[in-house]
Regions:
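Soluble, non-transmembrane alpha-helical interaction regions
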Residues: 40-133
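Bacterial N-terminal signal peptides
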Residues: 20-32
């Protein structure tokens, strides 16, 4: 009996051990399976993160748009607090209350513009590409003697002494290639004086700095802008400097130049003219290289027929779309003629036209039609 009882006890013990071992093995298997799945999932998540990070590491244009969006919002906030400080110091209660009422609208409008600029920049990245904007400039590839250019651009002639006069609405615009140069990043640029008169008063006095590449491309390396305003009651009534907005120079505070006019443009080409973030961010897109009046109803819109026929009868005028990433939704179309250069700007949304009325270097400029 005692022996039988001991045998039974040992059998029961072995059975329990076998069951326990089986359970442990099963649990271990389950743990390993789940552990394996967890590792696989972690590997997959890690791979996805790496792919996402790799993509983010190369979407430099979009990164720029996002960074500038945050900068814009911060600037709006800064502006609101400055405006608040101004309101606090207004003694008249009615004026002070009105000032505070304007704060909310200013914030809403400012943040709306920030979002619109972000979207405009992001959309532009799809056309411009995601690469860093960092043009490599070799001074040896540029002319330094503007009296003897290697390959002059017929659509953007930079001959010293050339002068153009444009008119439209209440505006007169005079551009002249001056006998002056600027040395920027080792490249010699010609200075173009650009003066804008509104209602007879000088409103803008700008010096543009253009560089001529030996392959015929024209580059834009900066501008010195003086925005002016004249005030009734001043004696003498002289224009007063009110801002230098838009001024930039390649190599200063992160500013970079850009292409201004290609020697061999093709329809669909798109490029930055200037890269001065939050200050000057103009983009050019080539719409046509074979324009003549009557060939495209969209491009004919607001175009003075006589002017276009004077310069584009051969069907070789170039039309560009020009827009600023700082002014979402707005654009202009510019028209260029061989041997003349820029002769017409149309702003379709506003219906505004600025047209060439005179030049001093080509007989086709004689008796041009008036606006």
């Amino acid at each position: 009996m005692n022996k039988s009882k001991g045998t039974t006890t040992r059998y029961s013990t072995r059975l329990v051990l076998r069951i326990a071992v089986g359970i442990v093995f099963a649990l271990a298997t389950v743990v390993l399976v789940f552990s394996g799945n967890s590792v696989a999932q972690r590997d997959n998540d890690s791979a996805q993160r790496e792919n996402g990070e790799a993509q983010r590491r190369t979407d430099f244009c979009s990164q720029t748009a996002r960074a500038l969006f945050e900068s814009c919002k911060a600037e709006v906030t800064d502006g609101i607090f400055k405006k608040k400080a101004i309101c606090i110091n207004i003694s008249d209660q009615k004026e002070r209350e009105q000032c505070f009422d304007e704060l909310d609208d200013a914030g809403e409008q400012g943040n709306l513009l920030c979002r619109q600029q972000r979207d405009e920049r992001t959309n532009a990245c799809q056309s411009l590409g995601e690469g860093r904007y960092d043009p490599h400039i070799n001074p040896a590839l540029f002319d330094d003697d503007f009296t003897n250019l290697t390959h002059p651009n017929p659509y953007f002639p930079l001959t010293i002494g050339n002068r153009w006069e444009y008119r439209g609405g209440n505006e007169v615009n005079i551009v002249e290639i001056l006998n002056r140069t600027k040395l920027i990043n080792g490249v010699r640029c010609i200075v173009a004086g650009d003066r804008v008169f509104k209602d007879g008063d000088l409103a803008e006095d700008t010096n543009d700095w253009f560089c001529q590449a030996k392959n015929g491309n024209v580059w834009y390396f900066g501008e010195e802008v003086k925005n002016l305003e004249s005030f009734d009651g001043d004696n003498p009534r002289l224009p007063e400097l009110v801002s230098i907005d838009g001024s930039f120079k390649f190599g200063r505070e992160g500013d970079k130049g850009g292409l201004f006019f290609l020697i061999s443009p093709r329809r669909g080409d798109i490029y930055l003219e200037e890269f001065s973030l939050t200050n000057a961010e103009d983009v050019t897109e080539i719409l046509s290289t074979t324009y003549r009046f009557g060939s495209n109803t969209v491009l004919d819109q607001f175009v003075p027929q006589q002017l276009a026929k004077r310069f584009c009868s051969s069907g070789d005028c170039i039309v560009t779309k020009n827009f600023s990433l700082l002014e979402p939704g707005l654009f202009a179309r510019k028209y260029y003629a061989r041997g003349i250069g820029f002769f017409l700007e149309v702003k379709p949304d506003a219906g505004e036209v600025l047209q060439l009325t005179d030049c001093n270097f080509d007989p086709r400029c004689t008796n041009l039609p008036s606006p």
